[in-house]
Structures are given as structure tokens and as C-alpha cells.
């Protein structure tokens, strides 16, 4: 798959923040109408201190049948800094994206979208590169305030930055911690909440696209795939 080359990656943390502040102006928060035919999940892990591994799994929806899996392993040059993970993980994701033959209608990232100090988490940032609707689903809160949803599957509450709604906190599995859902690009809060609920099977905490991407990341790390 092709993508837009919006900036280089040889940046200092200060330069990276400036890039985020410029790119955030380009984000489009719009409803996603209908249902996707193909949905992709993205997971990244770090087998070594300077080595990263990106996996993209494309699923048919609503069967969740795996259509394609691509991966990319390579050197990581940007330091780990909360709020700047796209600069650490983005280059590997884009190299994996270039290998993809099946175009997904929606891409789900294990990370943040709008729920970010500068409104540009990895789901938003990479969404601008690939120009496909994206959603961030994180296991923990990076930014924003919320009231804990009740311990009931599919219960939820809004995530706020002041009075602005920047995402949702969704209890996908009873008895488990909620996930933090926010739109990336070409997506809005309500659509991202609706789709993440639809992508998460009963008894699971993590939506199938990123859950399966994580499974294959771990298999690749162990040399089992």
C-alpha cells in the first residue's frame, strides 16, 4: 500500500513536538458510516533495546477471518518518550504498510488517537500518512479525565480534555479493566466507540484486530511464525 510522505524521521524530540502541532491541524473527525469489509490491526513490540517489530493483520469483517499478515523488523532510533511514540514506531509501521496488498477500510492501532496531549497519538499521526479511517485503542490512559464505567460489558463513559470529548472509556469485558478508545483520522468519537464494540468478541478485552496482531507479534518474536 502507498502512503503520503509528510515528514522525515531524523528529528529531535523538540522538532517532533513541532511536527505534531502542525499535523494536528490536518486531522478530520468525521462519522464513519456503514460497516467495513476489511479491518486491520496494528501491533508493535521491541525484541531488543534498539530493535522493533511491527505487525499488521487484515481481517474480513464480520467473520474476522484473517486475509493477510505482514511484518517488518528493524532498528529503532528514536527514544521512548510518552506522547512521541509515533516517531519511535511509525517508520516500522510504514515499512510494513508498504508490503500490504489488501486495502483495509478501517485500521485499529494499539495506542492513542485524539486522546493525546497534542491531539495526535499514533492512530491520528499514521492516519494522516495512510489516509484511511483509524482508531486508537489503548490499555491505559495517557491523557484526559473520566468517570469509571460500571462493571458491565459494553458500558462506557466519555474521556474529556476539559469540556472537550476526546474519546471513550469502554468496558469490553466484565471484570476487566476498560480500554481507552479515541478516533484517529477520518473517524469520530461515536463511530470509534461503535466499531470497537463491534470488533470485540464476548469474553475478550481487546478488539480482534489488535488482539490477533499482538498474538502474531509474540509468535514472530519467538520464531514461531
UniProtKB/Swiss-Prot annotation:
GO CC annotation, single: cytoplasm
Localization of this protein: Cytoplasm
Reaction it catalyzes: Endonucleolytic cleavage at apurinic or apyrimidinic sites to products with a 5'-phosphate
Domain of life of the native organism: Bacteria
Predominant place of localization: cytoplasm
Cofactor(s) the record lists: Mg(2+)
The keyword Phosphoprotein belongs to this UniProt entry's keyword annotation: no
Disulfide bridges in this chain: none
Gene Ontology terms, MF aspect: deoxyribonuclease V activity; magnesium ion binding; RNA endonuclease activity, producing 5'-phosphomonoesters; single-stranded RNA binding
Enzyme class: hydrolase
Site residues by UniProt (Interaction with target DNA): 80
Protein name: Endonuclease V
Lineage of the species this protein comes from: Bacteria, Thermotogati, Thermotogota, Thermotogae, Thermotogales
